[in-house]
Amino acid sequence: MGNGRWSAQDWQTYSSASVAGKSQQQIFTSRHMQDQYNPALITMRESRDSADNPQATPIILASDVTGSMGLIAEKLMREGLNTLATEIYDRKPVSDPHIMIMGVGDAKTDQAPLQVTQFEADIRVAEQARELWLEGYGGGNGGESYMAAHLFAATKVSADAWEKHGRKGYLVTIGDEPVHDGMTRDEIQRVLGISAEADLSAREILAMAERNWEVFHIVLANEGYARGRVDRVLDTWKPLLPERTIQLQDVDALAETVVSLIQVNEGARPADVAASWSGSTAMVVADALKGMPARTGRGGGLQRLR
């Protein structure tokens, strides 16, 4: 998947018809997980080069959709996706973005702890994201199954970026809660449709994902669970991603922060990137990028569970 190119005009037309003036419930009308987004029923998601996108870069945004975190998906639909795509085109930190949206929940309690769109390069990513179910539950158990996103990316994504060009994609999880320490065998089977010989820890899953993906997590420091308890959230994330756990103070700057961390990871100076944004966004991005080093990597191939 991933033909076509993002167009601000296409976005404006789509947004006017399907997003503007609508409530969250009116935007996201699904009341159950649709089969086409059920990871257990998906054999493989593909990001392929094409005439439109000859050097495709897969980018996954995996958003917590439990509790109040439906606000992330809503903000992406209202303007974030357009900002993300147009700024990547304009700034060119990576080539030819192919965007996938994931909805993340709790594999211990939720009916739909992971939902997965296709990789798309045009307005189809917005059309699919709008069909995700904002289940809104979460287990109330002090964590979410963000690692389901990493395990899917490691085992069920095939991309020309690493298979042909030796380049990694970008996987950014976003939320307000601590991360559960991996997934049990039963959870892996139920959520992903994969048979595993044993439970997998968060470190084991991350090691699999990091072979092909530049992995980051954005903590929404002033939202939901993290508000007043951000240290509890960081205590679970920082040991896993010490330099790639990003604290975001203002969710309105989410898309700009994602673009910025890609720029820095591709070699730009954090101070220069932050200064390139206007007004308060520059300050929010500068704070989010604190301590993040520039680094690059090469891809290595699809992962299999034994």
Regions found by a protein language model. Give the residues of each.
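Acidic, low-complexity intrinsically disordered regions
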Residues: M1-R306
